[in-house]
Amino acid sequence: MFVTNGGFYMRKFLCCRDNFAEKQAWQKYCWVNIEMPTEEDTLYLTRDLKIPSAFLSDIRDVDERPRIETEDGWTLMILRIPYRDEGNDIPYITVPLGIIMKADYFVTICHHATDMLPDFIRYMQRKKLPIDGSWDLLFRLFLSSSVWYLKYLKQINNQSRAVEKELERSIQNAELQRLLKIEKSLVFFITSLRGNDNLLVKLKNLKSQREFFDPDLVEDVEIELRQAQDTARIYSDI
């Protein structure tokens, strides 16, 4: 966590060659992970790292679709990840995770404090899994997103079953509204997973980068993503 005179900021420098140990500043092999970026974070990204400001605007757009683009030597990938917001009218939605890469730099930006990212860091630290370059880290994040889709889909299904049991006893407007919100969550998930699938296809077609891919890891990503898609469709059809 980064500290300034203004307070605490969710900017972390995690060394991938040192079991994701947190550093005080960027150094080679560090992953810059920023959650809920502040104005100071934006200045750091655009002024110090020279990341195109258009990339940051795209990540800020809550409706931004999964895609990949390049500018000034930087590569931006937007992945839709699941997010649980109990204070929201619809408790399960998806939000953009921006992944920005260039040479030794690997930056992730999310405008929401998700369950996925801190869990991913803890998991990697606990398992002491090696990271072999930026693409390896990218695909591991991709894999983690699908795992979290499956976790939330299980929760959604459990909630749906509970609501249906209530409706069997007596039809109440409040329960019908809950069921509609659950269905909306499933629509969000299905749409985002389809977009992530399209992104994965584009990544696999990057011939100039394919030599840096771990084929076994990419296959794991494909399997988990397909499982999440199939599960979401099954729950939606029930």
Q: Positions of the model-derived regions?
A:
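Membrane-interface, cytosolic juxtamembrane amphipathic helix immediately N-terminal to a transmembrane helix
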Residues: 230-238
